[in-house]
UniProtKB/Swiss-Prot annotation:
<dbReference type="InterPro" id="IPR004161">
    <property type="entry name" value="EFTu-like_2"/>
</dbReference>
<feature type="binding site">
    <location>
        <position position="26"/>
    </location>
    <ligand>
        <name>Mg(2+)</name>
    </ligand>
</feature>
<keyword id="KW-0460">Magnesium</keyword>
<dbReference type="InterPro" id="IPR041709">
    <property type="entry name" value="EF-Tu_GTP-bd"/>
</dbReference>
<feature type="region of interest" description="G1">
    <location>
        <begin position="19"/>
        <end position="26"/>
    </location>
</feature>
<comment type="function">
    <text>GTP hydrolase that promotes the GTP-dependent binding of aminoacyl-tRNA to the A-site of ribosomes during protein biosynthesis.</text>
</comment>
<feature type="region of interest" description="G4">
    <location>
        <begin position="136"/>
        <end position="139"/>
    </location>
</feature>
<dbReference type="GO" id="GO:0003746">
    <property type="term" value="F:translation elongation factor activity"/>
</dbReference>
<keyword id="KW-0479">Metal-binding</keyword>
<dbReference type="InterPro" id="IPR004160">
    <property type="entry name" value="Transl_elong_EFTu/EF1A_C"/>
</dbReference>
<protein>
    <recommendedName>
        <fullName>Elongation factor Tu</fullName>
        <ecNumber>3.6.5.3</ecNumber>
    </recommendedName>
</protein>
<dbReference type="InterPro" id="IPR027417">
    <property type="entry name" value="P-loop_NTPase"/>
</dbReference>
<dbReference type="GO" id="GO:0003924">
    <property type="term" value="F:GTPase activity"/>
</dbReference>
<dbReference type="Pfam" id="PF03143">
    <property type="entry name" value="GTP_EFTU_D3"/>
</dbReference>
<comment type="subunit">
    <text>Monomer.</text>
</comment>
<feature type="region of interest" description="G3">
    <location>
        <begin position="81"/>
        <end position="84"/>
    </location>
</feature>
<keyword id="KW-0251">Elongation factor</keyword>
């Protein structure tokens, strides 16, 4: 089948199902595609197909992620579902597939379980903007009061992790009943699926487009062009850059250099503007080649500052994933790959009661770099040692 052109007529959102193993995340994903396929807005993707998700590599880490797409009357969705618990952790920390909204699936038969909590904590740490709860398997619980109890527990859990637990939408239903339902879209088994989709359309906020955010471009390379000046190249991470725009060069020291971009070029052609996602060269006014280097960023003035010390949620690779074979303690000094920067840092603090971190752990820690780098909350990074990736992290708070 030929690749269809992606038509941007509707707002696009990235969403995903999260929750404890066997609570029905994948069945719910299948049910959504089945229901929408009756209107020609999705290809029905059965459980087995989603479950054997292909492998992807992100920051040197292998993750299994299934990408499903569908649309409602109002929106276009890219939906991710991960087969294994570790895949969810790795996905959320590396940001392989970021979420504009999450659907937390909780089985009425079990209530919130350990992985439910871990996924909610991660959603908070990586700032998933909104959450909807789907209480699944309600057909297997005879007593409605038990479902009320599960709902109460889930709302309490969400409050604990600073989601609006008292106010956010909770939908009850059976994903399996919808998957097994007839091809009549009015079949009552589809009612909770329709309710979920309507709620997603209304409740998940529309994400800010990358081009509307303040300009930022990590510096990949620096050239000196005789008679013209210094050109830095890189891929624009967010925002827009136009000739004449003032930018700051941030990172490597606490001092921030200001300059003006006098020309933006792509494939040797002069551009009116460079947009998020473009690989460009920016000519900088009055900057010598030795005043800017790989690892720094060009950014809209005042939009990002250099820091050395931050808190992060880190996933430590298992031996089987190519990670370390042994645990590490405070004082461990690996390399941190932050955008294009490659900088040594020290692990200076673990949570209370944690003496050492084992391969396979998912843990919060405080990191101190040997020199300042442009850092912000929600930013992803890799931890490497001796040429191999040993961990992946996301910045949860700036310390200094």
């Amino acid at each position: 089948m030929a690749k269809e052109k992606f038509v941007r007529s509707k707002p696009h959102l990235n969403v995903g199902t999260i929750g404890h193993i066997d609570h029905g995340k994948t069945t719910l994903t299948a049910a959504i595609t089945k229901y929408l396929s009756l209107f020609g807005r999705a290809d029905y993707t059965p459980y087995e197909q989603i479950d054997k998700a292909p492998e992807e590599k992100e920051r040197g880490i292998t993750i299994n992620i299934a990408h499903i797409e569908y649309e409602t009357e109002k929106r276009h969705y890219a939906h991710i579902d991960c087969p294994g618990h570790a895949d969810y952790i790795k996905n959320m920390i590396t940001g392989a597939a970021q979420m504009d909204g999450a659907i937390l699936v909780v089985a009425a038969t079990d209530g919130p379980m350990p992985q439910t909590r871990e996924h909610v904590l991660l959603a908070r740490q990586v700032n998933v903007p909104a959450m909807i709860v789907f209480i699944n398997k309600t057909d297997m619980v005879d007593d409605e009061e038990l479902v009320d109890l599960v709902e109460m527990e889930v709302r309490e859990l969400l409050n604990k992790y600073e989601f609006p637990g008292d106010d956010l939408p909770v939908i009850r239903g059976s994903a399996l009943k919808a998957v097994e339902a007839s091809n009549d879209p009015n079949d009552e088994a589809y009612a909770p699926i329709k309710e979920l989709l309507d709620t997603m359309d209304e409740y998940f906020p529309e994400p800010q487009r990358e081009t509307d955010k303040p300009f930022l471009m990590p510096v990949e390379d620096v050239f000196s062009i005789t008679g013209r000046g210094t050109v830095v190249t890189g891929r624009i991470e967010r925002g827009v850059i136009r000739p004449g725009d003032e930018v700051e060069i941030v990172g490597m020291s606490y001092e921030v250099n200001k300059t003006v971009v006098t020309s933006v070029e792509m494939f040797r052609k002069i551009l009116d503007e460079g947009l998020a996602g473009d690989n460009v060269g920016c000519l900088l006014r009055g900057i010598d080649k030795d005043e800017v280097e790989r690892g720094q960023v060009l950014a809209k003035p005042g939009s990002i500052t250099p820091h050395t010390t931050f808190k992060a949620q880190v996933y430590v690779l298992k031996k089987e994933e190519g990670g370390r074979h042994t645990p590490f303690q405070k004082g461990y000094k690996p390399q941190f790959f932050i955008r294009t920067a490659d900088v040594t840092g020290e692990l200076i603090e673990f949570p209370a009661g944690v003496e050492m971190v084992m391969p396979g752990d998912n843990v919060e820690m405080t990191i101190k770099l040997i020199y300042p780098v442009a850092i912000e909350e929600g930013m992803r990074f890799a931890i490497r040692e001796g040429g191999r990736t040993v961990g992946a992290g996301v910045v949860t708070a700036i310390v200094e």
